């Protein structure tokens, strides 16, 4: 019994492999394009053209996804712009206040 190796040693003490696992594969259409060339797009007149334009707007790389939030369900939601508050613009209603006080 002392010469046998415990099952927990076989499970937890394995050496890690030096080669990393491939998490995803690059599709052939993207592998063939070089540099900043745009990937081929589907027909603009197709039924999903509205969806594709919205998706391109969301995935626009110039904004780096700062205006997009991913919900717990995995859907992309666009963040709404926050309006300026009175603390940021204290002189916003000064003209209106002066008009009332002169009456």
UniProtKB/Swiss-Prot annotation:
Pfam families: ATAD4. Residues 53-63, 93-103 have a biased composition (Basic and acidic residues). Residues 28-103 are annotated as: Disordered. InterPro entries: PRR15. PANTHER family: PROLINE-RICH PROTEIN 15-LIKE PROTEIN, PTHR14581. Belongs to the PRR15 family. This is Proline-rich protein 15-like protein. It comes from Homo sapiens. The lineage of its organism: Eukaryota, Metazoa, Chordata, Craniata, Vertebrata.
